[in-house]
């Protein structure tokens, strides 16, 4: 939270007065100003408040459905990466201006920023992002599937790859089916295609596939 270092004379205002070339990065939960500035920020809280948990986990209504945090402290890690980039940019700017900067970096800012593609999906398609488990909103099939002895991941990024999947699965007719021939069609008919693929993948072991 903000303000903790000022009591020791280690805030940016005090230190930059001694060294105007100082590049100083403050990482807090909610930034240097605003109603939450003096609140502590934890990765778990930020994943919820920033929206990451709204798109992570199984869909509502399924067994195990509901909000789920990512398995690592992702917001903490990404904030560190954002900080390193910002510091390098400030150092480069100092080469031209001779002055340092105070970088105000909030966990919540980063948590929201990493959902930029979800915002783009909404602006483009008008659909509010939802939890989809391991599925992908814009690509089908792109998720986990059962095998005879476990699970595997299929990440089919284009129609050519889908045709090759159909051949490998012994189902060439899928690629000719108008419901599945293009990615746009597969998205529209996801509920019909995914059960068909699951039936086939479950017949062989992961190694066989």
Predicted regions: what they are:
Residues 140-209:
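Aromatic-enriched alpha-helical interface/lid elements that frame and gate functional surfaces
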Residues 1-4:
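Short acidic, glycine-rich surface-loop motifs adjacent to enzyme active sites
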Residues 6-152, 156-157, 163:
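Active-site-adjacent "lid/gating" segments in soluble enzymes
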């Amino acid at each position: 939270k903000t303000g903790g270092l000022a009591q020791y004379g280690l805030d940016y205002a005090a230190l930059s007065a001694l060294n105007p070339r100082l590049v100083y990065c403050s990482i807090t939960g909610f930034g240097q100003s605003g109603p939450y500035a003096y609140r502590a920020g934890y990765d778990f809280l930020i994943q919820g408040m920033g929206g990451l948990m709204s798109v992570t986990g199984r869909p509502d209504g399924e067994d195990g459905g509901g909000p789920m945090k990512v398995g690592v402290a992702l917001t903490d890690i990404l904030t560190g990466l954002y900080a390193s980039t910002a510091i390098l940019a400030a150092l480069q700017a100092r080469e031209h201006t001779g002055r340092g900067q105070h970088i105000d970096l909030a966990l919540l800012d980063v948590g929201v920023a990493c959902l930029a593609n979800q915002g783009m999906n909404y602006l483009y398609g008008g659909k509010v992002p939802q939890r989809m488990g391991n599925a992908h909103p814009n690509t089908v099939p792109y998720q986990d599937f059962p095998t005879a002895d476990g699970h595997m991941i299929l990440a089919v990024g284009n129609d050519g790859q889908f045709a090759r999947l159909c051949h490998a699965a012994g189902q060439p007719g899928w690629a000719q089916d108008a419901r599945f021939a293009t990615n746009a069609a597969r998205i529209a008919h996801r509920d019909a295609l995914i059960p068909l693929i699951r039936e086939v993948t479950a017949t062989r072991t992961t190694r066989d596939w």
